[in-house]
Amino acid sequence: MQQFVEQHKEVLKATMPGVKGHEVKLQQLDDWWGKVSLIGKINSLRLGSDILTSMDVTKQRFNLLQHTLIDNLLQEQTRKVLLYDKACCQMAMDVLTRNLFERTADIGFLATDQQICQFMAQADTQETEQAVLLRHLQHYVANYSVYDDVVLLAADGRILLRLNQQHSATHSNDPLLQLSLTQGSSYTETCRYSDLQPDKALSLIYSQPVYDAQQQVLGVLCLCFNIADELHTIFSKLLIANQHSMMALVTADGSVAFSSDQTKLPVLSKAETVQRLKLHRHEQKNYLISVASSRGYQQYYGPGWQVQMWTPLDTLTQTSTLPVTDNTLAETGLFPALSAIKLESMQVNDELSLIVLNGEIAAARKHAIEFIPVLNAIRGIGQDIYQVFSSSIDELAATIMHSQLLELTTLAELAADIMDRNLYERANDCRWWAQNASFRQALAQPDITDAQRQALAQQLAYINGLYTVYQTIYLYDARLQLVASSTGDAGGVMEAGSAAEACLKLSQPQQYAVSDFVPSQLYQQQPTYIYNAALFHPSHSEQVIGGIGLVFDSTPQFSAMLSDILPKDEHGGIKAGYSACFTDASGQVISAVNAKWQAGTVLPLPAAFYQQALQQALTRQCELGGQRYLVAIAPTKGYREYKTSDGYQNQLFACLLLQYQITAGC
């Protein structure tokens, strides 16, 4: 950062009228001081040189401090924008990476779907059979609404079936078909134009071969992810507080895959990949480009993309401010460099006042009356310089404080959004897996053999291997007896807190039941959520014959969500003073990145904070455990259908905390 500012100092300064104005004022005062000192030297021969020499030394200290101030003003004005921009880029990249990881698991699971395999194994299919599978895929996309098409390809490129009936093509020449067949039983990720979606300039498609029971290739399954819709949602949320900027997803070859401003950065235009902060001129305008690449999630890193944020250089200082008092500046500890400059300028001004006072005493003793106006003028200049220092620092501190509060609020909202997005997937998984034909056929039988239990356990283990966010996945029957699990356990009765009983009362495949966040035997007596969906009889669609339970691996998953969104230092560690947690409406902690607050304990914030946060994310000062914090609270609002229209209610909050040193009342 410092090297970047030093390299582009004059360009940056030209876009910051406030900084330039302070520099001009200080230079004018310095010039006037020089002229007044010269007059003093000419007209004060009787005083000797000691006082004037002391004044010159003090003037030199002011000059050095002036350069330090201007450099810090440039640094901080630039830093407040770039740190926020960098954070937004990383947030967008992290959210997208998490989302795409789920897609890699989806394609692996769906490629083994019994109904899809049976359909593709037939040489010829009737309209009735096509309609049945089409409904099956419609149910899938009703759960996983992030897809805008599902396509089944024969090995020769024939389109056997597709969800989006608006496309009339019957054959595809897309190279992803052969690439997928070459890859074997792993997924292929394709991001470019595809004749499978001819109306799009760029598609993101996950594909994987489909095999029969003898491991003969039947064709290729393609899931078309609606990346434009997803990125529009992500970017729009991050640009609410930064509407003059634009964001783009850039591929490894420097092409724009998606942009928040299609006019200035159209899809497939060249933006170039950048490795670090960059000053770039585009269409007669200077931009600061911040960038973030994937940090990976569950060993998945994505296709080598990066997110860029372009902020016009002339908007760096267009930030509203909040009042910041001397106490806030000095005591919070949030602005150490600025506080040090302000303190030093005060000390230098005090020294100058003493020198002037000594000069007045010496002038009186030696009857050098002509020197008094010079001393008064220099005293006034010193006071004016200090006022410039003081006002410029206070203005900047107010700007930085505003940015700090905005950052905390944004991070809290992001944490809440990431949680909703993650748990949205969990609600989808349980409902879709409950429609698995082999699960339903097995539980529809009056008795299940040991061999069948073992086969079910193997299927569950395969799924669990794809979806590693679960501790275990299990099936239970209508008597609440454990039938099979991904860990090999069987037998026994489902515990009361698992939501299994509530699941057996469900009446629709689109419904699901979730346990409270309480300790569970299925999770080593640690608190977690268990997601359940009912299995319906294959022939009697209204009869519930059991359920599937998904034990969310909440401890590492929630912790990773919080850790990912917290600001990082240059070494990649969480910045000092920052912590975060998820809580329920009563303040009970679900997860925390702070040893002080463990799951099940209570974050002792006033209840009014949570009530006010329901209306809008907020930031407050508060004392916790004898320490002072800035606390941002954001409510979870749901994602797509999850907690918005699916009937599930569980109000949670994300809390971001920044510890500081002020000791005044809350």
Residue spans for each PLM region:
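Extracellular/periplasmic juxtamembrane segments that couple receptor/chemosensory ectodomains to their
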Residues: 2-76, 263-403, 602-666
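Extracytoplasmic/periplasmic ligand-binding sensor regions of membrane-associated signaling proteins
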Residues: 134, 139-224, 230, 276-285, ...
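Extracytoplasmic/periplasmic sensory segments of membrane signal-transduction proteins
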Residues: 27-185, 365-509, 562-573
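Residue-level signal for short segments within beta-strands and strand-turn junctions
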Residues: 154, 161, 251-252, 311, ...
